[in-house]
A protein has these predicted regions:
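Divalent metal-cofactor coordination and adjacent catalytic microenvironments
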Residues: 1-275
């Protein structure tokens, strides 16, 4: 069974390797999961898909802290010494600011960057484990505009501009009313999603929708496939650093824990600061 943390899928890897048969499907699936976990460890990130985090920090009388996960999609709680801090609305010209928390904006495309949570009108006062923040973070397309298909089978794929669909974040009508996910046979106000394909009820045909979903950045998916392909090929030359070809020439193999091309591509996604 595929792991929720896999950075690619079996079908994509087999296409990458130009493999048609199924004899090595189990091995390739295991490689995907192992390499995906190794990549997340290198990045020092528990996951790259949208998830909820509740984190505790030591206050140091600063105005800002750097949240540990990114990109941050929303903050549901900011508390100091047990006192909830409300969000501070944008500052209008000529108007006084309102005290509260402010989140740095996220980059529109991956890899993104770690974001600050700042306070207006107060500080993260000195204390041990006295600051709590609850937030949603991970690579996500929020509110992608779409129209429910008007012809059978009433199914559509998301645009996925930065990488393959990986998790559902909900569907809502343009007026903000949420649709409910179901396992099959949707009726009005319901939808089915599988591998990034959304299916709606005939009665919702033509409805204006906003779709939210998590995705795996294409860079990370390619890194996973490149590294898995390298490990798959390594089976035929385990322990070898070179091989003589008929005594006329020698083929040398580069044996490294992380291939150079993978390490370079992963660098922009790594956590460089541990707050």
């Amino acid at each position: 069974m595929a792991s929720a943390y896999d950075l690619t899928n079996l079908s994509n890897l087999k296409t990458w390797l130009d493999i048609a048969g199924s004899e090595d499907d189990l091995l390739l699936s295991q490689l995907i999961t192992q390499i995906s976990r190794a990549i997340l460890n290198i990045l020092d990130r528990p996951s790259i898909l949208p998830g909820n985090y509740l984190e505790t920090y030591d206050g140091g009388n600063e105005c800002s802290i750097i949240l540990r996960q990114w990109p941050v999609n929303s903050v549901s709680l900011c508390g100091v010494n047990g006192v909830p801090i409300p969000p501070s609305p944008p500052i209008d010209a000529g108007a006084a600011f309102q005290a509260g928390f402010v989140l740095d904006g996220a980059d529109s495309a991956p890899p993104g960057r770690m974001q600050r949570l700042s306070l207006r009108g107060r500080r993260f006062t000195v204390g041990v484990q006295n600051v709590q923040v609850s937030y949603l973070a991970g690579y996500q397309i929020t509110g992608e505009a779409a129209m429910a298909p008007q012809a059978p089978p009433y199914a559509m794929s998301v645009l996925a501009p930065y990488g393959d669909w990986a998790s559902d974040g909900g569907v809502a009508y343009a007026n903000g009313v949420a649709l409910s996910p179901v396992a099959g046979n949707p009726i009005a106000g319901q939808y089915v999603v599988q591998n990034g394909v959304y299916t709606f009820a005939p009665s919702d045909a033509g409805a204006a929708l906003n779709i939210t979903y998590g995705y795996v950045p294409a860079d990370l998916a390619v890194c996973c496939m490149d590294w898995a392909a390298e490990r798959y090929a390594y089976r035929s030359r385990i322990g070898q650093q070179s091989k003589s070809l008929g005594g006329q020439e020698t083929m040398a193999f580069i044996v490294k824990d992380v291939p150079d091309f993978v390490a370079a591509a992963l660098q922009p996604y790594r956590r460089l600061v541990t707050p």
